[in-house]
Amino acid sequence: MKNVKIALTKGRLEKKAIEIFKTININTRELEDKGRKLIFNCENEEYNIELFLVKAKDVETYVEYGAADIGIVGKDTLMETNKEFYEVLDLNVGKCKFALAALPSFKLDQGYNRKKIATKYPNIAREYFRKKGMDVELIKIEGSVELGPIVGLADAIVDIVETGNTLRENGLVVVEDICEISARMIVNKASMKTKKDEIIKIIENVSEVIRQ
């Protein structure tokens, strides 16, 4: 049985993925009492798995370069970049959406001034406005993008919305939904050939859980 390395996004998706892994009998004991560890041995009679926790944006890099065979990451991260791997499963967890949001007075199709849009996801925002045939100025922000319209930096924002509470608390409203997103499983292209049996087994078992 070949060793399969899985890169997992820290935080909210980590917990959801661990629940799925437990359901298919992957050994998650070390993950449940991890302390400051980043690498975990999940080996048992059914699987020979090594799992490590990384930031969302790094999951793709580990998988693309083969340091990880499988990755669990949000679709938002995949949409913003253009890296080489297979996207094999929608895990149906970590569901949220991309949306255009602004102060209630904002009107997308009014005025002649070029709109300023604050976002952590410039590529996604650029494609959204390109499809609308609109020329906008994108302002990349790493922190709380909700501040943009409030302090006058931007007219609106493009960001992930889960419950909408953060928007409401800051006086913003959703102008338009852009797309739904959720957690995905990605696989290194070379690993799909060299560790095909082990990886297909994981994909099929996870698929069965998702369908239930």
Curated annotation (Swiss-Prot):
Localization: Cytoplasm
Gene3D superfamilies: Periplasmic binding protein-like II (3.40.190.10)
KW Acyltransferase (keyword) present: no
Annotated metabolic or biological route of this protein: Amino-acid biosynthesis; L-histidine biosynthesis; L-histidine from 5-phospho-alpha-D-ribose 1-diphosphate: step 1/9
InterPro entries: ATP_PRibTrfase_cat, ATP_PRibTrfase_CS, ATP_PRibTrfase_HisG, ATP_PRibTrfase_HisG_short
Cellular component GO terms, alphabetical: cytoplasm
EC number(s) from the headed UniProt entry: 2.4.2.17
Disulfide bridge positions per record: none
Catalytic activity, reaction form: 1-(5-phospho-beta-D-ribosyl)-ATP + diphosphate = 5-phospho-alpha-D-ribose 1-diphosphate + ATP
One Pfam family cited in the UniProt record for this chain: HisG
Enzyme class: transferase
GO BP terms in the entry: L-histidine biosynthetic process
Main location: cytoplasm
GO MF, one annotated term: ATP binding
Entry keyword set: Amino-acid biosynthesis, ATP-binding, Cytoplasm, Glycosyltransferase, Histidine biosynthesis, Nucleotide-binding, Transferase
Keyword Cytoplasm: yes
NCBIfam families to which the protein is assigned, alphabetical: hisG
Function of the protein: Catalyzes the condensation of ATP and 5-phosphoribose 1-diphosphate to form N'-(5'-phosphoribosyl)-ATP (PR-ATP). Has a crucial role in the pathway because the rate of histidine biosynthesis seems to be controlled primarily by regulation of HisG enzymatic activity.
Subunit organization: Heteromultimer composed of HisG and HisZ subunits.
Family, per entry: Belongs to the ATP phosphoribosyltransferase family. Short subfamily.
Domain comment (free text): Lacks the C-terminal regulatory region which is replaced by HisZ.
Protein name: ATP phosphoribosyltransferase
Chain's gene name: hisG
